[in-house]
Amino acid sequence: MLSPLKELLFPIHCFGCRAVGIEICSKCRKFWNPHFYLQSIEGLTVYSAIKYSPVARSILLGAKESSFKIADELIVEALVNCLKRLPTPIIRNAVLFPIPGSRGAIRKRGRDFIFEITQEVSMRCGVPIVSGMIIERSLLDQSGLSAVDRKRNINGAFKYRGEFIN
């Protein structure tokens, strides 16, 4: 009974095109379709669940800046899907390593978005979380930066103060 009233007062909009009725419409779903992507970046093997796109950006910002639980769930589902596809020798030794947000950003948002998502993914997959990463220096707001500027912005910004796993 309350659900139809809630939908009338607070309609769901597609994160991609803003169409009313569903969090991600079939047209925009092709830009948010969890897969298992594997690439090498500067000698580091990177596994990812989603290719970056305007739809992905909207979902990430919806979770990060607006605390939309629907966006959180889309991100968690994509990450869980990717982790479950990892080869057994890799997933057996995998850990989740959340990148910390600044105290100011966490205070402004009212939550530590990355840590909350990491906890949920850990719970669903049984992959442990390793903490100990700290912010060493202040960072610029990443939202308006290019890929090159983002890389420059985070270079040397984090430090690990935990035990290393062999």
Annotate each predicted stretch with a short phrase.
Residues 1-166:
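Glycine-rich phosphate/pyrophosphate-handling loop used in enzymes and phosphotransfer proteins
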